[in-house]
Amino acid sequence: MKLVDEAEILVTAGNGGNGCVGFRREKFIPLGGPDGGDGGNGGSVWIVADENVNTLVDFRHERAFKAQRGENGMGRQAYGKGGEDRVIVVPVGTVVMNVQTDEIIGDMTQHGDRLLVAKGGKGGLGNMHFKSSVNRAPRQSTTGEEGEERLLKLELKLLADVGLLGFPNAGKSTLIRAVSAATPKVADYPFTTLYPNLGVVSVEAYRSFVIADVPGLIEGAADGAGLGTQFLRHLQRTRLLLHLVDISPMDGGVDGVSPVDQVRTIERELERHDPALLEKPRWLVLNKADLMFPEEAQAAAEAIVAELGWTAPWYLVSALGRDGTFPIMKDVMAFFDRQREDELEARNAG
C-alpha cells in the first residue's frame, strides 16, 4: 500500500448570521417595541480520527472544506438557525499543523479523537438588545462575525509495528514482499521505494503485525539528503526496527560502503534526527546471503557482528529466496507477545 502521507487543506468556518431589525406589529399594538432576533452562529470545522481510514489520498482531490453560514435573525425575536458543522475524517496517527505558524494543533492518536480546527463566527445581535430608556425604537443591529479560516498541513505517521531501515538496495522491499502480501516495486537502483509501503505479516491464524518498508537512508538523511527527513519520521511510532544490511561482496558493499559502515552511518542519522530512535529495539538482518557460498556468508556475518559489537538479535537471510525470513517473523511475533504480557502486568500492578 502506498501511503500519501502529507496534504495541505484550507478550512473555513461559517460566518455568523446577521441580527435583525424588527418591530412588534400586531392588531391594536401599532407602536410595538423592537423584536429583531439574533443571527445564528456559523458552523465550525472539525477533524475526526477514524481507524477505518488508512490514507490521506482523498485530499488530492478535495482541498477546501467550508462549514455552513448561520442564518440571519428574524422578527418576533426569532433567532437564526446555526450553520452545520463540517467534519473532516482522517486516519488515526494524523498530525495536524497550522501552515502559517508551523504550530502543531493536534495529534490524532486514537479512534474518535475530535479536533476543532476552525470555529464558526458568532451570530449578530438583533435590535431587541439595543432598547433603552432613551431609545425605545432602536434601528441598530450587528452583523455576524466571520468564521475562522486556516491553512492546515496533515501529516500521517505510520502506525506500523515494525519498521525496516537500511541503505538503498539493502533488500527491504524484497523482504516485505517475501513475508507479506504487499507488492512494492523492486529494482536494482537506489530509491526504488519512493513511498512508504505497509504489509500485514500473518504468522498464524489471528496473529499478525504490520510492517513498514520506508525508502532507503543514506548519509545526510537527517538533513534531507536522498529521501531524508520525509521518511525518517515514519520510524518514530514503530515498536521494533529491523536493520537490513547487504553483506554481498560486490564493490565491498552497497556503493562501496562496507556492511559495518552501512550500519554506523544509519545509526548516526537516526541519532541526529531523533536520539530516541536509537533506544528502540533494533535487530540486525544480514541480507543477500544467496550471493555467497553458505560458509562464506556465515563467516562474513559473524565477522560483521563481532566488529559492530552487536548484542541484540541478528539473522542471516536471503530475502529473494525467502531463506531465513520466516524465523524472523516468528521471533517478532513472540517479541510482541512478551511486550503485551509485560504491559498487562504493569497495568494490573498499577
Swiss-Prot record:
Keyword hit for Cell cycle: no
GO molecular function (one): GTP binding
Location of the OBG-type G domain: 160-337
Record-listed Mg(2+) binding positions: 173, 193
Cross-referenced CDD domains: Obg
Keyword Cytoplasm: yes
Main location as per UniProt: cytoplasm
GO BP of this protein: ribosome biogenesis
Cofactor dependence: Mg(2+)
Domain Obg: 1-159
Keywords: Cytoplasm, GTP-binding, Hydrolase, Magnesium, Metal-binding, Nucleotide-binding
Enzyme nomenclature, EC number: 3.6.5.-
Any single GO CC term annotated in Swiss-Prot or TrEMBL for this entry: cytoplasm
Pfam family, one: MMR_HSR1
Cell location: Cytoplasm
Positions that bind GTP: 166-173, 191-195, 213-216, 287-290, 318-320
Family: Belongs to the TRAFAC class OBG-HflX-like GTPase superfamily. OBG GTPase family.
Subunit and interaction comment: Monomer.
General function of this protein: An essential GTPase which binds GTP, GDP and possibly (p)ppGpp with moderate affinity, with high nucleotide exchange rates and a fairly low GTP hydrolysis rate. Plays a role in control of the cell cycle, stress response, ribosome biogenesis and in those bacteria that undergo differentiation, in morphogenesis control.
Designated name of the protein: GTPase Obg
Lineage, uppermost ranks: Bacteria, Pseudomonadati, Pseudomonadota, Gammaproteobacteria, Lysobacterales
Gene from which the chain derives: obg
